[in-house]
Swiss-Prot record:
PANTHER family: DNA-DIRECTED RNA POLYMERASE, DNA-DIRECTED RNA POLYMERASE SUBUNIT BETA
Role description: DNA-dependent RNA polymerase catalyzes the transcription of DNA into RNA using the four ribonucleoside triphosphates as substrates.
Catalytic activities: RNA(n) + a ribonucleoside 5'-triphosphate = RNA(n+1) + diphosphate
Entry protein name: DNA-directed RNA polymerase subunit beta'
Length: 680
């Protein structure tokens, strides 16, 4: 079991053959060492029991039933008086069957095999470290090419013949075909190397510190050279410099993590615990097996065949040995990553086998589905809709979701207030949805934030905390300003809601994760809570109006609307008398009484500085009254003057939408100013 306080992180990397052997081997009480899987069998077809030394062997991986060996004998687990601790007939230990979830085995490969992730995945780590083309290394791994061994003191047979013009070339044109298996082994050990063994030799001979020094020197030399004038050559230099940087970073990573490069070539192949690749019996007596079992069987079959060729058959041609090594390499490649070399392997029903990579990667892989994205308690999920009346730090939680998330808190409240005698009575009151339940739920939610998360959580603002309030319906209401942080919109997106339980989690949600405290982007510092989409359209409709300027009102009658205070002139067009209001409250009151529309033009008395008015602007019209006062009408404002040309008041031409928008901004500024004054 992993202790969460001692282990804060999990790292996946390469391990040595010695470490694989330490994981998989164990010494049973009679002194026998077990752990190697040598047979490609699973269960016996008659007894329906695991085969010895097979993929489900109970000696290697532990008993199927706790305390029961393969013979059927039973021992009490943990009883020190009972002896022995294992069955002398079958060699199975009397332990808990849960050991089959973590006890590993191993396959001892007759020939080394490269790990396909480090060879075929881009960038190829093996090609980067060896500074050789990937195509040549692939030919070397799959026995299409051979590698000449560097023997300094003795001249090699092939070099004397002139068979090797290059370090790596096709073995068909360099190796004599008359060698038998016995002679071929001696010849190959002296003259050439092919397959993954050649890669392992080259990786083992590397000095990572020298690689870093040489790469740095070459990078500096390329940097000192100026442009050649040839575009193609300049591009080659840039690509070479980028490659040298990647090579140095890779070598530094190997040094920093104490990983040897030759570990990218496998000599021991780990076998997963049986419970992670089960065989299940379904209706009708049929068996369903994990695809990995079949892929392991192919590896064992081909590995055993290669062992027989090298040990029992003394007259096997060298070509056949190389072909069998290639088959072992391909079988391991299919086990680790099916389809990485081209066409994936399929079963009899033309279905692609799921390899180890398919099991762990992707949305339905072991990590994202079981470890990272598993279901948790005190969480829910629903569609989000806009909540126009919500504050920035609030969210609307449906009653159905809220009562489920806070049910334990409501039960505790009912019992504390002596409204329920026990948990059963409290649950029945919740099922009956009594009014007191909603009152207690409101009290609980007032001091308890919730976390909203929208997948995928690509940055810190993908999960934020809110103060929940109860809403009707079955959807989560959200303030539209927080959508940009979540990268959400209201076209059917779903969000998950979580309840922080511990005091530490609640404090973190309040101090660090509240939406009104995350107004800036953590990446670039720009405002993240900005109006988008629906809000921009709403602001446009709110402030656009139907007419622009007094001229359109008087001389463009085609765009008019009918209002309650309209009169018809003899010219057969309708003229709308625009109402006057002393303050914004009267204008909004008239709108609520449906006397004017949201975009109806009106005159609003305003405290405007005379210096703002352009002195050169000429009024469009001047209306005189009987007492000598007159009105100067401009495009967007109106001035009432006396006979002595003194300003009585100023009216601006606006709409109810503009007034509402201005009042919201004014209230926000006043609230911000008050908050700043409290802080100081």
């Amino acid at each position: 079991m992993i202790d969460r306080y001692k282990h804060q992180q999990l790292r996946i990397g390469l391990v040595s053959p010695q470490q694989i052997s330490a994981w998989a081997t164990k010494i049973i009480p009679n002194g026998e060492i077990v752990g190697e899987v040598t047979k490609p069998y699973t269960f016996h077809y008659k007894t329906n029991k695991p085969e010895k030394d097979g993929l489900f062997c109970e000696r290697i991986f532990g008993p199927i039933k706790s305390g029961i060996c393969a013979c059927g004998n039973y021992r009490v687990i943990g009883d020190e008086k009972e002896d022995p601790k294992f069955c002398e007939q079958c060699g199975v230990e009397f332990v808990d069957s849960r050991i089959r979830r973590y006890q590993m085995g191993y396959i001892k490969l007759t020939c080394p095999v490269t790990h396909v992730w480090y060879l075929k995945r881009l960038p190829s780590y093996i090609a980067n470290l060896l500074d050789k083309p990937l195509k040549e290394l692939e030919g070397l791994v799959y026995c299409d090419f051979s590698f000449a061994r560097p023997i300094t003191k003795k001249p090699t047979f092939l070099r004397l013949r002139g068979s090797f013009e290059y370090e790596i070339q096709s073995w068909k044109y360099s190796i004599p075909l008359f060698f038998t298996t016995q002679g071929f082994d001696i010849f190959r050990n002296r003259e050439i190397s092919t397959g993954a063994g050649a890669i392992r030799e080259q990786l083992a001979d590397l000095d990572l510190r020298i690689i870093i020094e040489n790469s740095l020197v070459e990078w500096k030399q390329l940097g000192e050279e100026g442009p050649t004038g040839n575009e193609w050559e300049d591009r080659k230099i840039v690509r070479r410099k980028d490659f040298l940087v990647r090579r140095m970073e890779l070598a530094k990573h190997f040094i920093r993590t104490n990983i040897e490069p030759e570990w990218m070539v496998l000599c021991l192949l780990p076998v997963l615990p049986p419970e992670l690749r089960p065989i299940i019996q379904i209706e009708g007596g049929k068996l369903m097996s994990s695809d990995i079992n079949e892929l392991y069987r192919r590896v064992i079959y081909r590995n055993n065949t290669l062992t027989d060729l090298l040990t029992t058959s003394r007259s096997t041609p060298g070509e056949l040995v190389m072909c069998q090594e290639k088959l072992v390499q391909e079988a391991v490649d299919t086990l680790l990553d099916n389809g990485i070399r081209g066409q994936p392997m399929r079963d009899g029903h033309n279905k692609v086998y799921k390899s180890f990579s398919d099991v762990i990667e992707g949305k339905e892989g072991r990590f994202r589905e079981t470890l990272l994205g598993k279901r948790v308690d005190y969480s829910g999920r629903s569609v989000i809709v806009v909540g126009p009346s919500l504050s920035l730090h609030r969210c609307g939680l449906p009653r159905e979701i809220a009562i489920e998330l806070f049910q334990t808190f409501v039960i505790r409240g009912l019992i504390r207030q002596h409204l329920a005698s026990n948990i059963g009575v409290a649950k029945s009151q919740i099922r009956e949805k009594k009014p007191i339940v909603w009152e207690i739920l409101q009290e609980v939610m007032q001091g308890h934030p919730v976390l909203l998360n929208r997948a995928p959580t690509l940055h810190r603002l993908g999960i934020q905390s809110f103060q929940p309030i109860l809403v009707e319906g079955r959807t989560i209401c959200l303030h539209p300003l927080v959508c940009k942080g979540f990268n959400a919109d209201f076209d059917g997106d779903q969000m998950a809601v979580h309840v922080p339980l511990s005091l530490e989690a609640q404090a973190e949600a309040r101090l660090l994760m509240f939406s009104h405290m995350n107004l800036l982007s953590p990446a670039i510092g720009d405002p993240i809570s900005v109006p988008t989409q629906d809000m921009l359209i709403g602001l446009y409709v709110l402030t656009s109006g139907t007419r622009r300027g007094i001229c359109a009102n008087r001389y463009n009658p085609c765009n008019r609307k009918n209002y309650q205070n309209e009169r018809i002139y003899e010219t057969n067009y309708k003229y709308t008398k625009e109402p006057f209001f002393c303050n914004s409250y009267d204008a909004i009151g008239a709108y609520r009484q449906k006397k004017i529309n949201l975009d109806s033009p009106l005159w609003l008395r305003w405290q405007l500085d005379q210096r703002v008015i352009a002195s050169r602007e000429v009024p469009i019209e001047v209306h005189y009254e009987s007492f000598g006062n007159y009105h100067e009408i401009y495009a967007h404002y109106l001035i009432v003057r006396s006979v002595k040309k003194e300003n009585f008041c100023i009216y601006i031409r606006t709409t109810v939408g503009h007034i509402s928008f201005y009042r919201e901004i004014e209230e926000a500024i006043q609230g911000f100013s008050q908050a700043c004054s409290y802080d100081t």
